[in-house]
Structures are given as structure tokens and as C-alpha cells.
């Protein structure tokens, strides 16, 4: 819940019109993808967005709000769950954040009566 909220809030903060959210399950991994059409992120800045208190564009701070902790929290949750979060963005515009984690299925034991 916290991961979804932080990723969507971040996308809404920087997007001009569109935010898309999808959830997929592939084998034993689930992936949450949040995409926006915001200003984009330069390749050399993609890892920095997960550091606490990092704001890539301080000139937008007053207009967009936030304190630079949302993506750092997502990163910490990903590590705690044995998952990962990554940023795929173009400096020309738009960003995709993918949060993936292992899913452990507990199947019922039908052999005992």
C-alpha cells in the first residue's frame, strides 16, 4: 500500500496529464509499474532518485511539494521484501518506475484428511 501510494503520488506530482499503473504476476514475481508523462530523468540521475532527501529539480520544490523521501521509502521496502525498484526514464520526458518482489504461494495441503 505504501509503495503504490508513494509511486503514484510522485508520478502525479511531476506528470502533466497521464499516469498509468499496472500490476503483473509472472511466475513467482509480482511487478508494479507506474508510468507518467512528466519532465523525464537524465540517465545519470536515475539512481539518485532513491536517495533520501534528493530533489533533482530544486526549482520545482515549492510548486510540487514533498521532501524527497517517497522514493527512498519505496527503495527501503523493496530491499526489505527481497525485491527491487528501478527507474526507466528518458531525459526527453516520461518516467517508469518498476517495483518487483517475490511472491510466495502457500498452497493448501490436500493430502491429509
For the regions a language model picked out, list residue spans one by one.
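Conserved polar catalytic motif of the HATPase_c/GHKL fold
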Residues: 5-6, 10
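Short alpha-helical Gxxx[C/S/T] motif in the catalytic ATP-binding
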Residues: 70, 74
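Acidic ATP/Mg2+-coordinating residue in the GHKL
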Residues: 36
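Glycine-rich GHKL/ HATPase_c ATP-binding element in histidine kinases
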Residues: 93-97
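Short beta-strand/loop element within the Bergerat-fold HATPase_c
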Residues: 18-28
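Short conserved segment of the HATPase_c
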Residues: 41-55
Amino acid at each position: 500500500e505504501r509503495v503504490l501510494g508513494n509511486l503514484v503520488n510522485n508520478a502525479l506530482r511531476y506528470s502533466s496529464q497521464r499516469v498509468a499503473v499496472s500490476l503483473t504476476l509472472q511466475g513467482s514475481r509480482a511487478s508494479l509499474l507506474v508510468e507518467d508523462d512528466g519532465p523525464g530523468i537524465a540517465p545519470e540521475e536515475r539512481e539518485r532518485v532513491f536517495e533520501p532527501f534528493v530533489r533533482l529539480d530544486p526549482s520545482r520544490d515549492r510548486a510540487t511539494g514533498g521532501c524527497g523521501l517517497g522514493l527512498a521509502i519505496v527503495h527501503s521496502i523493496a530491499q526489505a521484501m527481497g525485491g527491487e525498484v528501478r527507474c526507466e526514464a528518458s531525459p526527453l520526458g516520461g518516467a517508469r518506475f518498476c517495483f518487483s518482489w517475490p511472491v510466495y504461494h502457500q498452497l493448501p495441503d490436500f493430502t491429509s484428511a
